[in-house]
Amino acid sequence: MHLQLIKDNIHSVVICYT
């Protein structure tokens, strides 16, 4: 259900973490 939101959040974290 909120997988899309979590994926988007993780993507943002990964980009910021990189």
Curated annotation (Swiss-Prot):
Instruction: Please give the superkingdom of this protein's source.
Output: Bacteria
Q: What is this protein called?
A: Protein YtcB
Query: Could you tell me what induces this protein?
Result: Identified when cells are grown in rich medium (at protein level).
Q: Which gene encodes it?
A: ytcB
Organism, scientific name: Escherichia coli (strain K12)
